[in-house]
Amino acid sequence: MNPLTKVKLINELNEREVQLGVADKVSWHSEYKDSAWIFLGGLPYELTEGDIICVFSQYGEIVNINLVRDKKTGKSKGFCFLCYEDQRSTILAVDNFNGIKIKGRTIRVDHVSNYRAPKDSEEIDDVTRQLQEKGCGARTPSPSLSESSEDEKPTKKHKKDKKEKKKKKKEKEKADREVQAEQPSSSSPRRKTVKEKDDTGPKKHSSKNSERAQKSEPREGQKLPKSRTAYSGGAEDLERELKKEKPKHEHKSSSRREAREEKTRIRDRGRSSDAHSSWYNGRSEGRSYRSRSRSRDKSHRHKRARRSRERESSNPSDRWRH
């Protein structure tokens, strides 16, 4: 069968499995689960083992390689065999590298069920023998050696942790001693500042209360005359307004005292205003009475003068007699 047709058939199989969602156990790759070798065909003749490892090591670590060469000339025949460390990398290599092109040549990749190393002849070099026997992959350490090295590492780490903890404890003790030595010297000025703050606190509070009381008094004084004009006899309404104007933060006792004082002030002012109005009314009445009496006297005098003139005009003979 033509190698290109084999490439097409393998790709068609992979596509069908992907479309149908076939499980790994039922896949055609499961037939080669015991072999980690793959076959590479159609390689360019110029490629060496190193070039092949660089290309095909993308999906796993390569442990062994066998590039078939001509015994006389030493040139490659265009195909080789690869061995991966993990068998699952062979599945990835067959699915992805099958049908790729390197230097214009399509490459065929397929599984190998039972790979047998070629019979060694006397002409083979020592290097090729070592490669075929030991492989070209990195050696993994044995489990016993790895466990012993892991046991040694925690012991070393534990010792280092103990030393670091001791150093940290010493540093903390030194820092605590320095802080304790600094505390008595620094505590005295702090206490003084706290006392000064406590002393200034009530002073500020009292000054604020006095300022608020002073502000409330002129406001009350400004609003009193308006209340007089609006309410002639409304002492009770004034008291209500004054109670509303008082701040909420004042105590009940102080508010009651101020209300009583304001009541007495309002009463005194009402009395003085009544007396002033009565005095003014009496004075105006006296003036009107006087003006009336004066007008009466003037009219009476004019009448007398007229009468006397009439008498004189009526009796001129009496004047000459006298």
From Swiss-Prot:
Residues 155-171, 289-308 have a biased composition (Basic residues). PROSITE patterns: RRM (PS50102). Belongs to the IST3 family. Transmembrane segments: none annotated. Residues 134-322 are annotated as: Disordered. This is RNA-binding motif protein, X-linked 2. Part of the activated spliceosome B/catalytic step 1 spliceosome, one of the forms of the spliceosome which has a well-formed active site but still cannot catalyze the branching reaction and is composed of at least 52 proteins, the U2, U5 and U6 snRNAs and the pre-mRNA. Component of the minor spliceosome, which splices U12-type introns. Residues 36-114 form the RRM domain. Involved in pre-mRNA splicing as component of the activated spliceosome. As a component of the minor spliceosome, involved in the splicing of U12-type introns in pre-mRNAs. PANTHER family: RNA-BINDING MOTIF PROTEIN, X-LINKED 2. GO terms for cellular component: endoplasmic reticulum; nuclear membrane; nucleolus; nucleoplasm; nucleus; precatalytic spliceosome; spliceosomal complex; U2 snRNP. InterPro entries: Nucleotide-bd_a/b_plait_sf, RBD_domain_sf, RNA_proc/Spliceosome_comp, RRM_dom, RRM_Ist3-like. It comes from Homo sapiens (Human). The modification Phosphoserine is found at residues 149, 186, 188, 232, 272, 314. SUPFAM superfamilies: RNA-binding domain, RBD. The keyword Amino-acid biosynthesis does not apply. The modification Phosphothreonine is found at residue 140. Its main location: nucleus. Keywords: Isopeptide bond, mRNA processing, mRNA splicing, Nucleus, Phosphoprotein, RNA-binding, Spliceosome, Ubl conjugation. It is found in: Nucleus. One of its GO terms (biological process) is U2-type prespliceosome assembly. Residues 195-223, 240-274 have a biased composition (Basic and acidic residues). GO terms for molecular function: RNA binding. The keyword Phosphoprotein applies. There is a cross-link at residues 8, 243 (Glycyl lysine isopeptide (Lys-Gly) (interchain with G-Cter in SUMO2)).
